[in-house]
Each structure stands twice: as C-alpha cells, then as structure tokens.
C-alpha cells in the first residue's frame, strides 16, 4: 500500500506494493495492480517470468495509478489524521470494548510504532459490545460508511472480519489473532472526521 508515506526508512533491499483495491497508493479501488521495487539482480530474475506470463497493467490502469500518485501525500496525511482522531474518540466510547491503533497512547507497542513510523496509518480496529450480533447491528446501522471487505479507498469502509476476510478460520484461530465476534475493522476515508464519527455514533445508538 502506501507504507512509504507512513513507515520510516529502513534497510530493506526489496519491496512489494499493492497499488489498488486494498492498497492506498491509488486509493480509489478502481482496479488491480502491483509494483516490485528491488535490486537489479532480483528484477533481472523477474523480467524473464514477466515476459513469459505477461502480467502487465492495462494502459488505463497505468494512467489512473500515475495520476493517483500525485495526491498520495495529501491523501495519506488525511487518512492518518482522521484515523488517529477517530481512535482517540472511540476509546471509552459507550458500546465499544476496546480500540486498536498503533499511535494510541494506550497501545502496548506505541513507542515501537513511533520509532518505526511517522504516522499510524488509516486502519482502526475495535470491538463492539454484544459479540457477533452486536457487530452486525452496528454495521447495519451505518449509513455513510460503506460495508465491504475492501480497504484503502477514499471513502470509509467497515468490515466484519469474522464473517468475511477471516471466515474460513476456526473460532479458536480467530481468537489467537485477536479477532473476536464483535471485531470491526474501519478503513478510514477522507470524509470530514465529524461526519465519520456521527455515523458511528448513530450506528451505536447514540
């Protein structure tokens, strides 16, 4: 995704980026794409594979991606500032049991996150009281925020991992990953943060 706008520089030689759908480099969910940045040696090995299999972007997708890169910095700053504001507001919120966001002062690894990252990203995870039923009531009560298993769009998207992205796992496996029946993942968009919070508040019955 747009990790280079969030993570601080490190010594990695190779990197793979998701450009569309669940990544924020394009950030508008308009088509698939990926990019590999690597040493000349690795790129040389990949070039043969690419020539044989032909995984090339269509011209229109390449154009959309190139235009999206022009606004990446502005978009990521807004995604991250919105996400931090929402995470802070949801802590102690009636109907919310816990909130996870790497830049929250209450996060057990907040100091590590601050050393490794300049911003906390655009994804906020929290648990709605009432288990799976409570999570579904919340999701069905959303009006502005979209309900989907997609992430990284310009609009805010809420996902219920237990019944979508992680539904094939057993309940025990999900528990080990910290995914409870009431867990909701919120991919925070570019809307006014007050509008996002108002939709969350209404869905929680506030």
Predicted regions and their residues:
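Active-site beta-loop-alpha junctions enriched in small/polar residues
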Residues: 1-2, 23, 104, 129, ...
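Conserved PLP-enzyme active-site core in the AAT-like
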Residues: 1-94
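Positively charged, small/polar-rich N-terminal and surface patches that mediate targeting and assembly
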Residues: 10, 37, 98, 152-153, ...
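Short, flexible turn/loop "capping" segments at secondary-structure junctions
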Residues: 27, 59-61, 116-119, 176-180
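A generic structural signal for well-ordered coil/turn residues at beta-strand boundaries
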Residues: 32, 59, 120-122, 151-154, ...
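Short, well-ordered beta-strand elements within core beta-sheets of diverse protein domains
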Residues: 65-74, 122-129, 185-189
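Conserved small-domain helix->loop->beta segment predominantly found in fold-type I
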Residues: 84-152, 169-171, 175
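PLP-dependent enzyme catalytic core of the Aspartate aminotransferase-like
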Residues: 140, 156-206
């Amino acid at each position: 995704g747009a990790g280079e706008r969030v993570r601080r520089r490190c010594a990695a030689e190779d990197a793979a980026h998701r450009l569309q759908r669940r990544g924020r480099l394009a950030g508008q969910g308009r088509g698939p794409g990926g990019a590999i940045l690597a040493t000349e040696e690795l790129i040389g090995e990949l070039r043969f594979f690419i020539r044989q299999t032909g995984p090339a972007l269509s011209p229109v997708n390449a154009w959309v991606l190139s235009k999206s890169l022009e606004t990446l910095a502005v978009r990521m700053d807004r995604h991250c500032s919105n996400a931090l504001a929402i995470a802070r507001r949801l802590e102690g919120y009636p109907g919310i049991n816990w909130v996870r966001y790497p830049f929250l002062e209450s996060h057990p690894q907040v100091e590590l996150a601050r050393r490794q990252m300049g911003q906390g990203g655009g994804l906020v995870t929290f648990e709605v009281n009432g288990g799976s039923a409570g999570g579904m009531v919340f999701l069905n009560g959303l009006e502005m925020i979209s309900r989907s298993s997609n992430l990284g769009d310009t609009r805010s998207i809420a996902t219920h991992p237990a019944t979508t992205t992680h539904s094939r796992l057993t309940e025990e496996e999900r528990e080990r990953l910290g995914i409870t029946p009431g867990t909701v993942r919120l991919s925070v968009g570019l809307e006014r943060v007050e509008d996002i919070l108002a939709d969350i508040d209404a869905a929680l019955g506030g």
